[in-house]
């Protein structure tokens, strides 16, 4: 039998305690996630719950959703490292990238986000094309929304309509579902929003489809992504990326998460995907 001196025994015990404490601390690490509030808080929480549980298992850390009040707060939260990962629209990513001096990294996006679109909706039978909007009331979503403001504004400008001059009134509802509600209730005659929220409302029959219809669908553009701060360790960033890329519709868990995220699958993303949106933002005077 090997006998240790009291000093060596104490040293061994302290080493063991430090290792155990380190393992415990690692297990109790908090990984914070946020998302732009492009839908109601209850809907965002419902969509996030299974994904957070999945990420907890993959990362070996407690994953917590941190809600924010507006798009700007989501940008500031990631730029200032108050959260570890954020769900951004294309334009909010650009804002975060500019605000941080290039210190944020888009890791994944849905396959759908490689060719995302917006829709213009109306309850007015006389509106059949974008040019028919002249002199009407129009609602965008948030001013920082890619699919609910920036890209619809860009396509209006391409059609020869200046939202700041050619409409009777321009409103900002703050969220895609709120835009649908504004059009359905008659508060505005038309609205622009994210196609995936529109399709979900149609599928779930959340409004009278006989009253509100799509009259214009935009050409495709890059949109949403999951973004992290560049200071995140490369190993953790890779683990996180692989967790998303591993999601599969072949498993019950994967199908549930992908359905809630309205995704076929997740694919790698990169900064260059959003150069077009950055150019549109600068052209519109929003950057």
Regions found by a protein language model. Give the residues of each.
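Bacterial N-terminal signal peptides that target proteins for export
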Residues: 2-14
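N-terminal signal peptide c-region/cleavage motif recognized by signal peptidases
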Residues: 22-24
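An extracytoplasmic/periplasmic, membrane-proximal ligand-sensing/linker region
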Residues: 28-35, 39-50, 221-223, 227-287
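Extracytoplasmic small-molecule ligand-binding "clamshell" domains
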Residues: 28-92
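Short coil/turn segments
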Residues: 38-41, 45, 112, 121-127, ...
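Short helices/loops that flank or line small-molecule/ion binding pockets
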Residues: 72-86, 99-100, 131-134, 175-196
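Acidic, polar ligand-binding/catalytic clefts
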Residues: 76-132
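Pocket-lining segment of extracytoplasmic ligand-binding domains
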Residues: 126, 136-235
């Amino acid at each position: 039998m090997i006998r240790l001196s009291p000093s060596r025994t104490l040293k061994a015990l302290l080493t063991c305690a430090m290792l155990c404490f380190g393992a415990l601390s690692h297990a109790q690490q908090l990984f914070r996630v946020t998302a732009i509030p492009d839908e109601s808080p209850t809907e965002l929480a419902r969509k996030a719950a299974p994904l957070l549980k999945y990420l907890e298992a993959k990362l070996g850390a407690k994953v917590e959703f941190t809600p924010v009040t507006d798009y700007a707060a989501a940008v500031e939260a990631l730029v200032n490292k108050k959260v570890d990962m954020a769900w951004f629209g294309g334009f909010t990513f650009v804002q975060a990238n500019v605000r941080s001096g290039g210190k944020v990294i888009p890791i994944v996006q849905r396959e759908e986000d490689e060719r995302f679109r917006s829709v213009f909706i109306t309850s007015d039978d006389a509106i059949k094309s974008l040019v028919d909007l002249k002199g009407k009331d129009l609602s965008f979503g948030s001013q920082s929304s890619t699919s609910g403001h920036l890209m619809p504004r860009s396509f209006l400008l391409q059609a020869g309509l200046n939202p700041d001059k050619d409409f009777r009134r321009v409103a900002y509802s703050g969220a895609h579902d709120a835009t649908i509600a504004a059009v359905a209730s008659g508060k505005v005659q038309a609205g622009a929003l994210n196609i995936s929220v529109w399709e979900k409302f149609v599928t779930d029959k959340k409004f009278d489809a006989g009253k509100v219809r799509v009259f214009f669908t935009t050409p495709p553009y890059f949109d949403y992504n999951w973004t992290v701060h560049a200071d995140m360790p490369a190993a953790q960033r890779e683990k996180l990326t692989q967790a998303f890329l591993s999601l599969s519709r072949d498993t019950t868990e994967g199908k549930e998460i992908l359905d809630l995220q309205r995704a076929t699958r997740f694919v790698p993303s990169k900064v260059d995907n959003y150069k077009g949106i950055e150019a549109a933002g600068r052209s519109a005077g929003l950057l």
